[in-house]
Amino acid sequence: MSPYLSKASNVLSLTVPIILYIISKAYNKFLSHNSISMTEKQFAVSVTNLRKRIGNKDILKGLSFNVENGEVFGIVGPNGAGKTTTLRILSGIIKNFEGYVKIFGLNPVEAKQKGYISYMPEDAFPYEKLTGYENLDFYAELYARGEKQLKEKYLKLGVEISNLGKRIYDKTAEYSRGMKRRLIIARTLMVMPKLSVLDEPTSALDVESAVRIRNIILDMARRYNMTIILSSHNMLEVEYLCDRITLINDGRVVASGKPEEIVKNTNSKNLEEAFIKLVFGDQ
């Protein structure tokens, strides 16, 4: 063998293992990345070590939880616990935070831009100079983005969800609080989002109106396999509506799981008693 061929052979014998090592590392990184992606896709919502600071105050101090697709999931806690801040982050409204948040594999802002998320704040009210129908028509037009058939589909579903009968054609200034709330939740859900985020959906409602709203939430979740995240102070409502919950206090998770599991684990009679024990201690 010529000295040139011998030298080339030696170079190859040294470089081939290095090349194979680099390829192997790249392949393993690819597999690892895809494995993470597949794990993300198993959940509608993934939250890990979520932190939010406003001014000098830490509002969220490392929240972690996952929400499965088609699940009605509750975020509960006392006033000031960080519920609304969490919901606003999940909805893509609050953009600056620390931690990991994915909505169907996307960050909240991307998911919002794709129309995956619909958010109903606690203080939402309809335009009172318009009728109920005109309110729904306005938002159906907005969400359909010029697609006539899609607008008609949204509008039809919105009228159905609100279940206001002939009152749908009255000015909303004449509506009771319960009727206004039904219209707002119809406006939120009629676009059939992949994720609906509802902040205190039955707040300050009479019993009949609250029951109507709860039934709407369950019906939409089941009919469209919609993932719904809601906050509530009403533990009876949470037990009735939610598949699982996360209870937060002072920006931290203090319990997570099915309502009945939390009741059992705290040796409580019901979720309200469990809530009191977990937040305020045995009294």
Language model region names:
Residues D137, E141, Q149-R167:
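Conserved ABC ATPase "signature" region
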Residues S196-E200:
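Catalytic Walker B motif of ABC-type/P-loop ATPase nucleotide-binding domains
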